[in-house]
From Swiss-Prot:
Residues 67-93, 179-199 are cytoplasmic. It is found in: Endoplasmic reticulum membrane; Mitochondrion membrane. One of its GO terms (cellular component) is mitochondrial membrane. It catalyses: a 1,2-diacyl-sn-glycero-3-phospho-N-methylethanolamine + S-adenosyl-L-methionine = a 1,2-diacyl-sn-glycero-3-phospho-N,N-dimethylethanolamine + S-adenosyl-L-homocysteine + H(+); a 1,2-diacyl-sn-glycero-3-phospho-N,N-dimethylethanolamine + S-adenosyl-L-methionine = a 1,2-diacyl-sn-glycero-3-phosphocholine + S-adenosyl-L-homocysteine + H(+); a 1,2-diacyl-sn-glycero-3-phosphoethanolamine + S-adenosyl-L-methionine = a 1,2-diacyl-sn-glycero-3-phospho-N-methylethanolamine + S-adenosyl-L-homocysteine + H(+); 1,2-di-(9Z-octadecenoyl)-sn-glycero-3-phospho-N-methylethanolamine + S-adenosyl-L-methionine = 1,2-di-(9Z-octadecenoyl)-sn-glycero-3-phospho-N,N-dimethylethanolamine + S-adenosyl-L-homocysteine + H(+). This is Phosphatidylethanolamine N-methyltransferase. The gene is PEMT. Keywords: Endoplasmic reticulum, Lipid biosynthesis, Lipid metabolism, Membrane, Methyltransferase, Mitochondrion, Phospholipid biosynthesis, Phospholipid metabolism, S-adenosyl-L-methionine, Transferase, Transmembrane, Transmembrane helix.
């Protein structure tokens, strides 16, 4: 880690922007989704929970594009690491991009748009929690797939800055998981309990 930090200017504006984007995104969607769950204000404002969820999902997608742009600009504005700058390591980076892409895309296909973008906070629930691939091999595959993509992108660019930012992405996702998982479990437990009472 000390060796990585020797390559990274922590005060460089692109790096600071990337850090802010990485931290802000999950904070934004968790705060807004919890607020919606408690107040239903977004659903009321947009006329339906589904439209409100689509709108929040669109905002999250745009924020993710911004985060990826900031991440890339931060890497390009700082030095490359010579020991990472070789064909073997480059191909490892490509493999990570591919694996991460598979996890992200298959998660989206398994969950659908509303499942991916916090539909459960809007009262849009699946029949049960999704357990098919990739959820059958990994918890939170969207988050870990995204982390693998950032790691692969950093390696392809031989970027110590990218590696450091990827570590931050992973840390922020771990915090988000601790915050989100109990809530999701509680929602589906309540749904199962209500279904049991009706039967």
């Amino acid at each position: 880690m000390t060796r990585l930090l020797g390559y990274v200017d922590l005060s460089e504006p692109h790096f600071v922007a990337a850090v802010l984007a990485i931290v802000f995104n999950p904070l934004f969607w968790n705060v807004v989704a919890r607020w919606e769950h408690k107040t239903r204000k977004l659903s009321k404002a947009f006329g339906s929970p589904r439209l409100a969820c689509y709108t929040l999902g669109g905002a999250i997608l745009l924020l993710n594009v911004l985060r990826s742009h900031c991440f890339t600009q931060a890497m390009l504005s700082q030095p490359r690491m010579q020991s990472l700058d070789n064909p073997a390591v480059y191909h490892v980076g490509l493999a990570l991009l591919g694996v991460g892409g598979v996890f992200v895309l298959s998660s989206f296909l398994a969950l659908g748009f509303t499942g991916t973008f916090l539909g459960d906070y809007f009262g849009i629930l699946k029949e049960a929690r999704v357990t098919m691939f990739p959820f059958s091999v990994l918890d939170n595959p969207m988050y870990w797939g995204s982390t693998a993509i950032y790691l692969g992108w950093a390696i392809v660019h031989a970027s110590p800055t990218g590696l450091l930012l990827t570590a931050l992405v992973a840390l922020i996702y771990m915090v988000a998981i601790v915050y989100e998982e109990p809530f999701t479990a509680e929602i589906y437990q309540q749904k199962a309990s209500q279904a049991y009472k009706r039967s």
